[in-house]
Amino acid sequence: MQTRKEKIISLFLVLIFLASCGTQELLPGASETPKAAPTAGAPLPTFTPTPQGFSTPILYGPNPDAFPANVNPLTGLQVKDPDLLRTPAMMLSISHFPVAARPQAGLSFAPWIFEFSITEGATRFLGVFYGEFPEPEIPIAGDCAVRRDPFAQTSTLLGNRIWWDENANGIQEDYEKGIGGICVNLYDAAGQLLQETTSDSNGYYGFNVEPGMYTVEYKIPAWLKFTEKNIGNEDKDSDADPLARRAEADVQSTLLYLDAGLVLSEETNPSVNGVAPPPAEVGPIRSGRLLYIDIHNFFPNSCFVFASASPQILPTLPQCYLVPHDEASGGAMIAIQKLKDLAEENRESRSGNFTYASNVFSETPPAGGWVANRIDVYVAYRNQSAFVYDPLSGSYWRYVDDTTQENAGVLHAEIDRLNGRQLQFENIIVLEVEQEVFEYQGQPIPALLDAYLELGGGGFATLFRDGMKYDIRWSLEAREYEQETGQARPIYFTDADGNPVPLKPGQTWLFVSTPYSFVTNQMDGSWNVRFIPPEGSK
């Protein structure tokens, strides 16, 4: 059987090194500096709880018939337009180097993002865009400072999300956005102000409390008002009284469903007058890599967009559209309208069915595991990143460096250029994948790596979700569904016995590592991922 190298020739990216990683500065901890004053002396309403039910916990997959028609099989979440699930994925090769590429535009819209080595200490992203197109946004925000740090839990949690009720139905849909910069005040049962905080860029707020009765007050601008309260299930409704602007809670254990939905009032929002949204484009886009061949094979009918590639491999890559190469700005951008047009053209030109339903999604985490509140990823001295767990959103906030020698290991929270929102991911997966230097006509090319994510393959992996770490397996072996239909499906995850390991509903970041890299427990709730490149690579 021919190896991939032979096929391409025939056609024409340790613990002992951690001492050199630099001092990492991360800031998990609430920085609560609201600017709106609490309502002094205002009488608190009488607490009269209304019993409500809760949504059935999500459990979907792995086969297509186990996903509702309006649920994205790559996230386990509802989509706004289910018809887009009939459009194959758009796969964008997105630059991470040079630093001019950052912050990238569109990453918060991608259900999956692969990060992989392109040698010389640099990494690149492959964004999987499916079920929703990116859109530029000037986020709706309150009058207070947006909270920019993950929440640090020290006691029982009370809080959760302030969101934009786009369809004004009083129900929090999966695709509706959060509202940052809302000041939130916490009162005890006697009406005494205890704490103040603000919502983060994705709308989450919270307090560390002891068991007891509390009132939460939301300080919203005059151009916003509350949606109707107590519609539907407790975990998806708005709890704020539209007139009192408050919600009550009897806290006996962690309570993360005290939400507030907002809609426009009759007044005009002064903060957006004359402010233009970011350009409607995604990227920056850079060159294609050999890894795309394998990923294309398990994302059938997908459309790959990149900026050319090395001449030795370009003829073999899955080409859907090539963008002009622009190295000075970190890569060329692609207009969102062009992306939509390409997706429609690709949809119309493809024949045969496809499905990306391959994994199980569950709100209930697997049993066991180790505490994982932070993941530090070391690729090179000037390529360090981290994921910090936020218990309010149940996701990991992404942090990156600035690639400079003097600031090596100093990290900052990363946003999406399209909307200014914090990047956060519910699942972080480290894949152990065999990689080697590519050879062309018998000569190694140290700047090109070949990573083997081939159909029929498998290997070890690490899953981080819900602030926990799990040892799992990745697999591309054909299951009964593939054997009966002949259709390939995306990479999936199991335990050591081959049982499905559920992903958490939401976005997934996949780091393509090597079998000789390290995932090390720092014994303080944090983990280090140390990438070791293949022998002979740059």
Residue ranges and their predicted role:
Residues 19-20:
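C-terminal motif of bacterial Sec signal peptides marking the signal peptidase cleavage site
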Residues 166-180, 188-204, 208:
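Short, acidic Ser/Thr/Gly-rich low-complexity loop/linker segments typical of extracellular
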Residues 154-171, 183, 259:
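A short, Gly/Thr-enriched small/hydrophobic beta-strand-prone motif that recurs across taxa
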Residues 53-114, 119-154, 265-538:
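A surface/extracellular/periplasmic glyco- and lipid-processing/surface-interacting theme
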Residues 210, 220-266:
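Structured interaction patches on ligand/partner-binding surfaces of diverse proteins
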Residues 214-216:
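A short tyrosine-centered beta-strand micro-motif
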